[in-house]
Amino acid sequence: MPLVRYRKVAILGYRSVGKTSLAHQFVEGEFLEGYDPTVENTYSKTVTLGKDEFHLHLVDTAGQDEYSILPYSLIIGVHGYVLVYSVNSLRSFQIVKNLYQKLHEGHGKTRLSVLLVGNKADLSPEREVQAVEGKKLAESWGAMFMESSARDNQLTQDVFIKVIQEIARVENSYGRQDRRCYLM
């Protein structure tokens, strides 16, 4: 019988970058056409990786900006983060830098389990952020990077598989993440 591990993952980013679309595509297997701003939603899905099962609890947040204050509910008890920007919005890329800084400070400047995602790769002709810029930013954080398209279901499953792998990588390099001390 496989070991079941619970993982809480917060999805953060500027408004209209496709956070809800990524989560919905992953869990429900369909793209949401209309845009209805999210206040906060949760999604759950169980994923099997190797011999282990992971019960993912996804927290789909409202769009943040540089003035947003991250609540402690997005710091305490969260195992990993998917920071999302839109490849056709330089502003969303700048906001994701601020969000990472706030998370980093909220966690006491310890290493975080973060996956940086350039979403809306299907809008590449309107691109304002090159993939190399996303990769460079993620490397500066010691994080993983990928691009995806919730609309085309391009690498949507991989986003959440990679964040599970990133959580394991960080836990293995620093010991169990849930043993950390949180500063409030």
Swiss-Prot record:
Q: Which organism is it from?
A: Mus musculus
Q: How does the record say this protein sits in the membrane?
A: Lipid-anchor
Motif Effector region: where in chain: 35-43
Q: Does the keyword Hydrolase apply?
A: yes
- Which amino acids does the record list as binding GTP? 16-21, 32-38, 63, 119-122, 149-150
Q: Which GO terms describe its biological process?
A: TOR signaling
The reply to whether 4Fe-4S figures as a keyword in the UniProt entry is no
Family classification: Belongs to the small GTPase superfamily. Rheb family.
Give one Pfam family, short name only: Ras
Q: Which sites bind Mg(2+)?
A: 38
Reaction catalysis annotation = GTP + H2O = GDP + phosphate + H(+)
Coiled-coil stretches are none
Q: Which residues form the propeptide?
A: 182-184
Q: What is this protein called?
A: GTPase RhebL1
Indicate the principal place this protein occupies in or around the cell. membrane
- GO CC annotation terms, alphabetical: cytoplasm; endomembrane system; membrane
The record's subunit annotation is: Interacts with MTOR.
Domain of life of the source? Eukaryota
Molecular function terms, GO-annotated: GTP binding; GTPase activity; metal ion binding
Question: What SMART domains does the record point to?
Answer: RAB, RAS, RHO
| Covalent lipid sites (S-farnesyl cysteine) | 181
Sites where Cysteine methyl ester occurs are at: 181
Organismal lineage: Eukaryota, Metazoa, Chordata, Craniata, Vertebrata
Q: Where in the cell is it found?
A: Endomembrane system; Cytoplasm
List the keywords (alphabetical): Cytoplasm, GTP-binding, Hydrolase, Lipoprotein, Magnesium, Membrane, Metal-binding, Methylation, Nucleotide-binding, Prenylation
